[in-house]
């Protein structure tokens, strides 16, 4: 596995085409530890595709991706899964939590699946949920409010102490009050924990919280306001 001197997230020369359409055209992007970058753009412009490439769920035709000092482009599936668990945290629009499990069980799950001790996983999950303001009782996650579910999803993404935190429309399904709380939580948490945060959103109000904003259109990623 190739090691890099840089931490955070770096994308270089990334290209992805599907059915003759270019979604990512030599994309260049870097996010330093503790920094936040928001990517906006029209629906279907390739924003989520960029995140899927970083996660290794789809394979780009060209380019390199380095996360947490590790070049992950071209890794075999077993190596990629290991690096993804250790280096990347992900928050989706709808949380992708198991509704029948309690918040603690959902948050502890990544550690348990990676062979961690049950006691340690649950203790850490309870600490994170308390820190993020989520009830840590036995109530099924599916019965929580939308904001509480997203906070639980953030806790689950953080339990492995990732170098890079990815968020795909994390506030898109929330009411205004919950949206404000989750957005504030994401940006504050990334800064305080030294995570490189890359967030995809249609919401310019949410995007304005980021240290930098980029727009993806026609396959080209450019910093907002750049000439």
PLM-predicted stretches and their roles:
Residues 140-144, 148-150:
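Conserved ABC ATPase signature
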Residues 161:
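Conserved catalytic motifs of ABC-family nucleotide-binding domains
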Residues 55:
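Helix-to-loop junction immediately C-terminal to a conserved catalytic motif
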Residues 101-109:
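Short coil-to-helix segment of the ABC ATPase nucleotide-binding domain corresponding to the Q-loop/switch region
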Residues 128-142:
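Conserved ABC nucleotide-binding domain
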Residues 63-71:
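Conserved ABC transporter NBD signature motif
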Residues 165-168:
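Catalytic Walker B motif of ABC-type/P-loop ATPase nucleotide-binding domains
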């Amino acid at each position: 596995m190739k090691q890099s001197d840089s931490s955070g997230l770096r994308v270089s020369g990334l290209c992805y085409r599907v059915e003759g359409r270019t979604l990512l055209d030599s994309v260049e992007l870097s996010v330093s530890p503790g920094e936040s970058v928001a990517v906006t753009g029209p629906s279907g412009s390739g924003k989520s595709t960029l995140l899927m490439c970083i996660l290794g769920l789809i394979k780009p035709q060209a380019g390199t991706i380095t996360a947490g000092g590790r070049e992950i482009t071209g890794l075999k599936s077993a190596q990629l899964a290991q690096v993804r668990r250790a280096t990347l945290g992900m928050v989706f629009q709808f949380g992708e939590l198991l509704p029948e499990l309690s918040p603690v069980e959902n948050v502890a799950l990544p550690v348990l699946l990676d062979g961690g001790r049950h006691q340690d996983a649950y203790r850490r999950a309870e600490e994170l949920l308390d820190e993020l303001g989520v009830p840590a009782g036995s109530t099924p996650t599916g019965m929580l409010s939308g904001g509480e579910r997203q906070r639980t999803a953030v806790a689950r993404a953080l339990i492995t102490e990732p170098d890079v935190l990815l968020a795909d429309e994390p506030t898109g399904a929330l009411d205004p009050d919950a949206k404000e709380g989750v957005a504030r939580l994401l940006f504050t948490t990334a800064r305080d924990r030294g995570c490189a945060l890359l967030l995809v959103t249609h919401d310019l109000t949410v995007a304005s919280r980021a240290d930098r904003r980029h727009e993806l259109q026609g396959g080209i990623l450019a910093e907002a306001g750049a000439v």
